[in-house]
């Protein structure tokens, strides 16, 4: 994982969501994405890459590529980072 030092990593200026995964599906995915996008707008850290990476189909692909059946996916967005972690 390549993490860039920015105000989000140093001071917590960013948004995150922890999404439950059951039977390979993200639970309440659209609600999580909507909440993240709202926070991203409020912090003024919107950019096209964030919109692409937070597309529901991209998130579902990430889950499938890792064969996640159960667990949690954490998504962190800061000014310079978009991180996905199990």
Residue spans for each PLM region:
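Conserved alpha/beta cores of soluble small-molecule-handling proteins
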Residues: 1-86
């Amino acid at each position: 994982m390549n993490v860039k030092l920015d105000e989000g990593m140093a001071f917590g200026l960013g948004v995150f969501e922890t999404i439950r995964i059951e039977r390979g599906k993200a639970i309440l995915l659209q609600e999580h994405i909507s909440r993240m996008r709202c926070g991203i707008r409020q912090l003024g850290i919107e950019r096209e890459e964030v919109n692409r990476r937070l597309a529901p189909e991209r998130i579902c692909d990430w889950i499938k590529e890792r064969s996640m059946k159960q667990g949690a996916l954490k998504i962190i967005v800061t000014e310079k980072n978009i991180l996905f972690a199990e």
